[in-house]
Structure formats: structure tokens, C-alpha cells
Amino acid sequence: MKIYQHQNSEKTKIGSVDITSGQMTFFDPYPQTHFPNRLDQILDNGNFEVLLYKFKNPPKDNGIIAIEVVFKNSEPIKWQDANYFEDPKSDFHYTNSCGFISDTSIFQNETIISLNDRIDKVATTRNENELNYCQLEFDNKVKCVYFECGIGWYDQVVDLKWGFDNEEKICRLLVDFHSYLL
């Protein structure tokens, strides 16, 4: 599962997510009519960097290999599928080739329509040949990350994996799009 060490991948920091409630939500915002289930794992509060791994040679249209949220600087020594923990949100279903990572607390003051409007204002300013991602802020304090994981419409499900350090503590969350190709 050492995707970040593969010779054909490169890592880019695409932002950070603030966890203030101890719970995180990860979903494709566009096909939704309501906010989805949160991840059940209770997390430490803090600001955590979000990394994007993509193919570097040759570049691919849907070149994202994985998205990783880093909770601790320690390296994972083992990975577990989220469904192993009977988490109700054990995978990432995406239809519109995008994803959104945030603390669940933002949904107290947002609707899915207002969230999509915010994303549209920022995401439409990108260069068409670039992978798109952006950092969003709510109430000038809660940071969230939006990204596109391909071009066009898909109906796919990918696994969410929790990474654990040598103290058996959660240190990473990995959304694995294409690592089976490496």
C-alpha cells in the first residue's frame, strides 16, 4: 500500500481539512440531495493536510491515483478497509468525478445547494487541462477540500482505507482510485 513510493506517482498537497467535531465526511457533492453519512471513526481535532497522488508519466485524463488525509506524521505500518470497522461509510461512491472532504459540522449551516454553489464559483476558474482541486473555507475558520478525480460521468465505488501507525493509532485515510494499476 506504499502508493506514494511508486516511481510513476507524484504527490501534491491540495489543501487541508479542519476537524472540529471529531468526525469527517467524504463524498461526491453533485448527485446528492442531502448530506451523506459521516465516517464513524472518531478523530482528534486539528488541521490535517490532504495529499493527491497522480500519474506523472504518462499523464492520464483521470490521473488521480489516490487522495490521502494525513492525521499524524507517522508512517502507516498497516492498512484496514473501512468496512472492517463496520463503518456505515466504508467506500466512496462517485458519479460526477469529484469529491469533497470536510468536518461534519459545516452541514449545520449549509445546504447541499449552497455547498455546490460555493464549489462552482471556485472550480470554474481552473485551466481545462489541469486536475482541479481547491481549498474552501466556511465561516472563515473551517477548511474543506474539493477535488475532481476524472473527466466526465462515472458510476464507480472505490475503497476507503484507514492507515495505522506502530502505536495502533489512525494516522491516514486513503481513498484508493487506481493503485491496482501500478
Show which residues each predicted segment covers.
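Intrinsically disordered, low-complexity acidic regions enriched in Pro/Ser/Thr
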Residues: 1-182
